[in-house]
Amino acid sequence: MQATQPRLSFWQIWNVSFGFLGVQFGFALQNANVSRILSDLGADLHSLSLFWLVAPIMGLIVQPIVGSASDRTWNRLGRRRPFILAGAIAAVLGMILLPNAPLFVAFLAPMLMGALMVALMDASFNVCFQPFRSLVSDMVPPSQRNVGYSIQSLLINIGAVIGSILPFVLTNVIGLENTAQMGEVAPSVVWAFYIGATVLLGTVIWTVVRTKEYAPDEYNRYKGLTEEQPATEKAPKAPLGQRLSEFFTLVKDMPKTMKQLAVVQFFSWFALFIMWVYTTPAITQHIWNVDKQWFDPAYIAAAPMVPETIIMAKGAAGDWVGILFAAYSVFAAIFSIFLAKLADKFGRKTVYASSLALGGLSYVSFLLFQDLTM
């Protein structure tokens, strides 16, 4: 018989979700600065997208493995917390080493070191994020699920905004340099990653220490599971060929609406990845009028020197991209408040299509604006 899951206080829900702030802080720093870092380390403008392939590949590989493994784990730390803590420690390592890639030039080319650290960060963020979502689902009763997701959304947006603007703040408020020569990383970016690593580890440790997961028997009672059901989770897996066959059968039998949505999502992610990969060079060229030749490592290596105006423009543009990404997170948070009501009034398809259309127009509008304040 299913027992009633205890209700949590506001601060208990806050503690369960608090680590999301740190994880999203790290994601925001990565999204706004990885192209900037790799470009400074010597990546060609046209090869940046190859480095960014790491993110979806790691997501495809890591999330299902970690999700399945955490479902089968019960130890002194609990079910989800071991993965959250391990992922946070690995992510912190990547966040510290990535901006310091030039220090390892005796062992690895800085660009290769940077690529490896991006891979480590992406894998680690996924190790953190998947169990975090499951932890909220495990700990928060259905009657408080909306409150839980609201707090989660608030913390995610706070982390995204602060992480995005941090390099700008370190330069314009603290006074750190935001410029770097080829093969180096700007001090403001280096310190932003140090601070991000500290915030990530601190918030995750807070959640791990302040949250006590349910024991297996308690969890089974609250979720209405029998003793036999968890045991089936440890049953031997079907052969790979059988699992692939089942996967393609599921895809074939997927409802028509889901297939249509999959196509739309497929193309909409094009825009998101172009934004993450190329916003920094696009803003630098279009707003700061830096010629594209100054993104060519071969041209820079052959030039007698890089003009100070080019170096300063690249640094300022990189900081401003963080401001743009912070604004993106703020407006997304505001719009999400009204999204449900708009969908109820006009229908989900209409609201979704309108949102995509507005997003497309916003993309095109980058060509029309030549000033920072526009």
Regions found by a protein language model. Name each.
Residues A327, F331-F335, K341-M374:
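C-terminal transmembrane helical hairpin of 12-TM major facilitator-type secondary transporters
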Residues M1-F10, F107-L116, V127-C128, F132-R133, ...:
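Intracellular loop-helix junctions on the cytosolic face of multi-pass helical membrane proteins
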Residues I61-G78, I334-R348:
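Helix-to-loop junctions at the C-terminal end of transmembrane segments
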Residues P82-I84, A192, R348-S354:
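Juxtamembrane helix-start motifs in multi-pass secondary transporters
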Residues D44-V54, L112, S150, P187-S188, ...:
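Loop-to-transmembrane helix entry
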Residues F83-L108, A357-D371:
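C-terminal ends and interior cores of transmembrane alpha-helices
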Residues P56-L60, P64, V161, S329-I337, ...:
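Residue-level signature of mid-helix packing/kink "hotspots" within the transmembrane helices
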Residues Q2-M58, K259-V264, S268-D296, I300:
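Helix-loop boundary and gating motifs at the non-cytosolic
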